[in-house]
Amino acid sequence: MGINLVRKLLHKGHEVVSFDTQPFDYPERDLVEHVMGDIREKDALALAMRGSDWVVHAAAALPLNSDEEIYSVDIDGTRNVIEAAVSLGIKRFVHISSTAVYGVPKIGGMKEDSPLVGVGPYGKAKIEAEGIVAGFRDKVAATVIRPKSFIGPERLGVFSLLYDWASLGLHFPIPGHGNNLYQYLDVEDLCDAIYLALTCESSIANDTYNVGAREFGSFRSDFQAVLDRAGFGKKVRGFPVGPVLGILRLLDKLGWSPLYPWVYETAVKDSFVSIDRAVEKLKWSPQFSNSEALIRNYDWYVSHKADFSAQSGTTHRVPWKQGALGVAKIFFR
């Protein structure tokens, strides 16, 4: 998400400082002050923030990392970021959380005051991090944004599995019939929400907001839109929920799959949140439907596939290793 937000801020005429563990190797590198560092390094963090008016905290260790890394980055790191922001007199703070804080949904349409049930270390850490941020709201206008899984240019991660299979002309397997409603979010719409939170009245900013696509279809129909875009005439194929989830749980336990519990457990549930608060208070209006966002991301993947064909990792910047799931390709030609 970082580079997409950087581009938006530059387009709006702002000076931008990027603080990241990875080099800033984008075409805009000469337009941005980049500081390499880790949010667990307090001195480097404070140095990078000095002189800024706004801070957007989007750093996180994702579920493929170790439990220790997740808790260290997502909890301790968040505390460091907001403490530094307050000590330096930052005027506006935005924390990017996740709708994973709601856990595996029993019903769709969760609102910001719905119960929080973290699944796994990542979900639990996100809940605790939100609490840390909320504890500083008397000192800085602090927005917590809970996005649905967001996609778009420069974003890959788990969605690289779908795009890879689609681009190779393969059918794509899913657990169950796939008729459950499932909401995503385009990264451009997320950046719009962040910018609104940075520029609105402080009383409005000092709140928590769900953000997701306004228009979304079923799990099956939106994935099928990507296969249709690929143009090979392939289909999304559903398989019995029990056996598929059993296999995915086993592969996850053995470390042979990039899919973690929140991904595969929610894949068979209605998973969407209410965006009414963001629409009404932030005056946010998402542009992209699920299928539009997925197709936009797929098109970007295809046009840049050669650039990251030899890359993989545990961040959203690169494809994730498919593990045993990659072997299954031979059955879906």
Regions found by a protein language model. Give the residues of each.
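Active-site Tyr-X1-5-Lys
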Residues: 117-146
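NAD(P)H-binding glycine-rich loop region in Rossmannoid oxidoreductase-like domains
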Residues: 36-76, 84, 99-104
